[in-house]
Structures are given as structure tokens and as C-alpha cells.
């Protein structure tokens, strides 16, 4: 669902569009209560009508809200306005790791620094039962304070109730967005999937480690 610039979602004033991904559109917004700039992620209307997608959106909010780490994007709020589901996150300024890699290989000291920061963030998430499932350069933002992992849109709380939701979904790929999770799609982004994801198996912390290895390789080689 496209949200008009200047409109509101709950208390949040929409300033501009940032981009779009598998789980919806992202906007730059302002929280007038705290005079704070935030990022608001909106679930598409076509998906918000689907109970499975709404449940996944809420799962994303729960997963991220439990993670407090300097290299994981902070979630501030989640809400529903006139049937529109939205997630309010920390607004990050900086280029994506994908944009940086496109310019060529990173210096070795930066590769090591970012690798350590991502590893530390993943360890925190995994210890709390959260698997990112879609780790890739586009989901890492280079800020002044270091790298930040974003878009836990494919995150899975490692508990039976939520695992059953994921395992009940089909894993046959479509030509549409490979980041979507629904009947007829794979969880993840094709080029960064671990073998178990491609085979339709369950993902765990090792799945993220596989993707991290690819990130390190791309950072070092460009």
C-alpha cells in the first residue's frame, strides 16, 4: 500500500518514501511526540488481508523488539491504522553494504571490522532464538557507528508455535519476489540461500553463518 507524503499513520507523519522490499514499503517519518525521525515499514494491503502474512508481520515485530544490540536496527513500535499494519524502526543514515561492494573490494581492516560486528549481532540474535534467514549486503547498512543489520522480515522465533507456521508453508519458488513467504515461495533471497533452504528444509543459526561467509567473500573481492 502506498502512503501519501504528508499523511499520518497513527501518530507518525510521513515525510518521504525510502524504498520497498518483500514485506512492503518503507517510509521516512517523524514522531512528533518525541521529535524523532523514524523509518516506518508498511505491509501491502494485498498482503494484510491474508492472516498468514499478518501473523508473519507481527512475528517480525516481536522478533526484532527482543533484540537490543548496537549492530541491529532497533524497533520502536508496531501498529495498525485503518487496516494498515506498520512497523516503526530506527532511521538509519548511510549506504547499504551492497552499494559499497558495487564500488569494489573493501580494505581488509574494514572487512574484518564489519565481519566481527555482523558476527556479534548474529550471536545475540541466535542466543535469543531468532534467525535472520535473509542475510545479504542489501540488508546491512553502513552507519557512522558501524554496520547495522536490518529487515528481519524472514526472521523466525525458534519456538514450536511459530515454527509450525513456517513449516506449513510451501517451498516451491515463483518468479515473483523471492523474499516473500507464502504458499508457493521460498524463505530467503536465492543467491544467499544455504543448501537446506534451497531444499526446503528448516533454517537455523547455521543458515545465517553460511550467508555471512558469502558476505565476507563479497566484501573482500568486490
Please report, for each region that a protein language model flagged, where it lies by residue.
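Conserved ATP-binding/catalytic core of the eukaryotic-like protein kinase fold
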Residues: 1-222
